């Protein structure tokens, strides 16, 4: 946002996913809320109309869908691991909801530099299929180059992702 001198609003929660999270709530449940844990609090989407929306979700899902004994896995999926169609549809529905809120925005569906983008990962393909299914020329995919690490991205890795996103926006979106 600083690079483009743009207004910035962020909706984020550590450990959150689209289909399952490390905590009880998933992003599709809290996105429309003013207060994440209050299901009766509704955000007024007319208050802010972004030109660009960047979505960086699915990293937490990549781990949790493989942990069948985790309480949140059991809560969301019972004893059955979600299949590719379920994951793609969940992502697609979330992005379709964003489009309904932001009908003119460019939406960038991204994955960060953690293991969701590791060579051989299926998750970029899930995002690509979901976006293709939307048939919306203003919804894009952009995947950050994988950076091997044993932890969350450090300052330099965050800068690398910012640089990658800046370049993508500058070359793809009529800003």
What are these regions (language model features)?
Residues 150-175:
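Histidine-centered active-site loop/cap adjacent to the catalytic His
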């Amino acid at each position: 946002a600083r690079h483009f001198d743009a207004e910035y609003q962020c909706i984020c929660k550590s450990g959150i996913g689209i289909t399952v999270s490390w905590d009880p709530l998933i992003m599709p449940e809290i996105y429309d809320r003013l207060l994440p844990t209050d299901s009766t609090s509704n955000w007024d989407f007319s208050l802010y109309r972004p030109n660009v929306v960047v979505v960086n979700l699915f990293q937490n899902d990549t781990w949790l869908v493989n942990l069948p004994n985790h309480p949140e896995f059991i809560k969301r999926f019972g004893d059955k691991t979600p299949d590719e169609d379920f994951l793609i549809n969940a992502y697609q529905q979330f992005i379709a909801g964003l489009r309904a809120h932001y009908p003119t925005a460019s939406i960038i569906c991204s994955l960060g530099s953690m293991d969701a983008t590791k060579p051989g990962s299926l998750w970029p393909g899930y995002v690509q299929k979901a976006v293709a299914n939307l048939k919306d020329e203003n919804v894009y995919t952009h995947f950050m180059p994988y950076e091997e690490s044993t932890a969350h991205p450090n300052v330099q890795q965050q800068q690398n992702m910012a640089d990658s996103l800046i370049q993508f926006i500058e070359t793809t979106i009529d800003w």
